Amino acid sequence: MPEKNSTWTPQDPVIELRGAHVVHKSRTGSLLRPDKVHAVNDVSLTVRRGETLGLVGESGCGKSTTARLMVGLQAPTAGEVYFKGRRLGHRASDRRALGRSVSMVFQDPATALNPRMVVHDTLIDPLNVHGIGSPREREAKVRDLLHLVGLPPSALDVLPRQISGGQRQRVA
């Protein structure tokens, strides 16, 4: 369980990185001294409720690694990640709590959607994983989401390659 912080309020940061570092061991170098790749070096930032954060930079600068830190998919080598004032640990329960509230939206919908899953399954999967609502409520939520982005109900039964790029973006 993450460390408790009972003083968190909705005005405080939802996600906070403090001096986050991620270092990967490379396959080059020797067995006892592998080369290291510094993917993220001393990143500190906060995101408050209702804010949207875009990470922009050149290829290989650490955007994806920083995003993975923020949504709990990557643990920092050093530094700390906080969610609603609680320090995130390395347990799956910590990541699940974060995953219910925070997500990444990828720029390219071709890579964001599983090409083997129909739109319905893509949309309902996170609701199933997090146990949100009853099965009937989940189905209603999926239909509501589709309506919200202006897609017809028939779009639920198609694979991503069967809809236009703009429609894929709206699904993603």
Model-inferred region functions:
Residues 29-34, 87-103, 121, 129, ...:
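ABC ATPase NBD coupling module
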Residues 137-154:
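Conserved ABC ATPase "signature" region
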Residues 56-57:
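The feature captures the beta-strand-to-loop junction immediately N-terminal to the Walker
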Residues 80-82, 86:
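ATP-binding/catalytic-site motifs of ATP-hydrolyzing domains
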Residues 71:
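Helix-to-loop junction immediately C-terminal to a conserved catalytic motif
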Residues 159-163, 167:
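Conserved ABC ATPase signature
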Residues 108, 117-128:
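Q-loop/switch helix immediately C-terminal to the Walker
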